[in-house]
Amino acid sequence: RDQPRSRGLGDVYKRQAFSIGLFMLLPTFLSSFVALATDSVLVRNLVDAVLRIAIFMTYMIAVSRMKDIRRVFSYHGAEHKTIFCYEKGLELTVENVRVQPKHHPRCGTSFMLVVIIVAILVNTVVFALFPVENVFLRILVQLALLPLVVGITYEFNRYVGGHDNPVTNFLAKPGLWMQNFTTFEPDDSMIEVAITALKLVIPEEKGKDAWGK
């Protein structure tokens, strides 16, 4: 009876390992070859940063061109529209949801992008203060710093998602732009699915769904 759940958790761990390997460890390994040409920590960190962002964007753009994934990303757009409708206090109907924006500041895509940016900043500071030449040791240090990076990212997204002002709107722009590749316009049937899913998790007590307060 526990087999499907165990299999599901295994898939989650595999995806997490893949993401860490592709977006964090691979750039570190590739940038290690820069050390053969220069002793500059700044140059090495800059190359690492460029590789991280380039790999992330290339992956997202490539995935978004896959037919089946585009359908998934349309459901993603329906989710965002439905949440916007709910947060505005409107009745959850297809008509009300359809006209809402498909980009949301608290999207997982934005979270992933901010994780990469925060990791770049944290790693730059740490390796500038405590230079590490061995590539495998650098990878271990980055893995050790990952909880800090994720924690900072969570608090950043929590603050940006919970406030509406020129500063937070500006900070949210990179993540919102990235959602051009991970959210597409849904059809009405997708919106109906999103509405049904949201209604199942709406708390009975008012205020229990407050975000960023």
Task: Identify the role of each PLM range.
Residues 41-53, 134-145:
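Hydrophobic alpha-helical transmembrane segments
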Residues 2-13:
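Single conserved hydrophobic/aromatic residue that forms the stacking wall/gate
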Residues 18, 22, 26, 54, ...:
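Hydrophobic alpha-helical membrane-associated segments
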Residues 20, 49, 108, 112, ...:
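Residue-level hotspots within the lipid-embedded alpha helices of multi-pass solute transporters
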Residues 46-53, 58-111, 159-213:
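Polar-ligand-bearing catalytic/cofactor-coordination segments
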Residues 140, 146, 158-163:
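Accessory, usually C-terminal, subdomains that scaffold auxiliary metal cofactors
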Residues 16-40, 115-141, 150, 154:
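Juxtamembrane "helix exit" motif at the C-terminal ends of alpha-helical transmembrane segments
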